[in-house]
Amino acid sequence: MGGWRRRLARPVDSPLVSLLPPIPTVWVFGDQLDRARGALAGRMPGECRVLFVESETLINSRRWHRQRLHLVLSAMAHFAAELRVEGFEVDYRRARTLGQGLRDHVAEFGTRRVLAMEPTSWDGRLELERLGVELVRNDLFLCHYDDFASWAAGRKRLTMEDFYRWQRLRLGVL
């Protein structure tokens, strides 16, 4: 199957480059395609390598609407291309599982540190922790679950009215 795996970055074989410590990898997922958010926020080209993995297992794990799946995969490829144009070293690969994609990336590039923004699912978070990925706080939501847990601690009842009042005070709205 020609073109099954698109490699957008290759390691440099120069002896001088091999003496340098490996740069960290920022792993970006299909629902985190934002240059100003998560583990990519504030990063400049040359500071990190960016990893994208199309996982067969994840794709086949549920019945996706064809157009939605196409949209997500296309958005990942386009975002990878944008980062490449910006000067980032990008490794875009397909693998059986996310873990296999990460292991292949680490084996190829000698990466010691992999960062990713917390996934939106608990299962995804547990998987990344199991793989030894350093997680960066997910800033895609208005209220992080840690903030909510702090607010909810010790309350006898959780009501939307109380939560909204707390949010308005916390965010300076109204």
Language-model features: locations:
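An acidic- and aromatic-residue-enriched active-site/binding cleft used to recognize and process polar
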Residues: D31, S55, A95-R96, P119-S121, ...
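Beta-rich, aromatic/charged-enriched effector core domains that present basic-aromatic interfaces
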Residues: G101-L174
